Amino acid sequence: MRNIMIIGTGGIGSYLVDFLSRIGIYDITVFDDDKLEEKNLTYQNYIPDTVGQTKVSAVNERLKVNGLKLVDEQPYLVLVEKQLKGYDLVICCADNLAVRRMLYRQGYGDDAKLKWLDLRAQGRNAALISYKVNENLVDDLLAGSEGSFSCQGGDWDGSPEQVNCMQIAVAGVASQWIQRWFIDNENVADKMVLNV
């Protein structure tokens, strides 16, 4: 089995877990300390019966309903680098820069202490950034305000008509990237940007 850690099971992570579970060849551990709220149902991959549960527990409930392989639930924040050890690939779907910075400190290219993937979506834009990225781009990639943000973007008014779906697009692209990376890690992009 291929051992994957996914940090964050919101807009991107909830779809990524589903895609990778369907494939059935991954051992997945998910970290997220958030609880599922009703407002999340509009753009995150959850079922209404799980509102109020931790997102990692709600992920398994949905996987169970669909007869898919369950994940290892870790309803905690990722706070220290030690938590990143022991995985073939660590994937950040979290909505804050502190976790991303910790991941990027693991290094780049052949010198990376661990292999990582950073997935982001905001409004009509999304990005996949891997440990293969040119280190000279890092300052730009890690620029921004502290704290968390919605993958829907700051101008989303909460209405279904205004929902953006880039979190689903980047989760799908990442699933394909992960499949290719485990087969031939030399033949994958260092980064991808999607905008509609």
Segments and roles (model prediction):
Residues 25-68:
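Glycine-rich phosphate-binding loop and adjoining beta1-alpha1-beta2 segment
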Residues 84-89, 93-196:
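Glycine-rich phosphate/adenylate-binding loop
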